[in-house]
Amino acid sequence: MLGTQTTNSKPREYGGLIVSTIYIVLFFAILNLTVFFNKTNNINLILKNSCVVSFVVVWLLVCLQGIVRLKTCDGARYEISKFNQYLKLGSIYAKPNISFDEYKAKSSSYRKQTRGFWWMNFSLYLLGSLISIVVSLL
């Protein structure tokens, strides 16, 4: 049995790298827009206000992403991973009412449901960046 193990053939997920890149691009885009459209001549004040606005907007987008992910299929995937830990540990406190084959079927269906989830995050980032640009111009 040990000789027939196969390596993990799942494709790598680059979602975290893409999301981090989007956040960095958003931060500098908002920063440049607020500097460009600012009406005062004091460069220190402009940079300080622009950095604060950019940081707060990106931080709010991160919070929004966390809320959305917890309320959708990623939250369900997290519950499945907790259940998987109980199966591996054989916990006497939490006896699962489901077999391991049923668990594998459920986890694969959750993976299929969450495959296109990054599009929803991307649309939220775009909407948030548009709102932040409008707010920073006021």
From Swiss-Prot:
Compartments in which it is found: Cell membrane
State the protein's name. Answer: Uncharacterized protein MG076 homolog
One GO CC annotation:
plasma membrane
Membrane-spanning residues: 17-37, 43-63, 117-137
Tell me which UniProt keywords the record has, alphabetically: Cell membrane, Membrane, Transmembrane, Transmembrane helix
Q: How does it sit in the membrane?
A: Multi-pass membrane protein
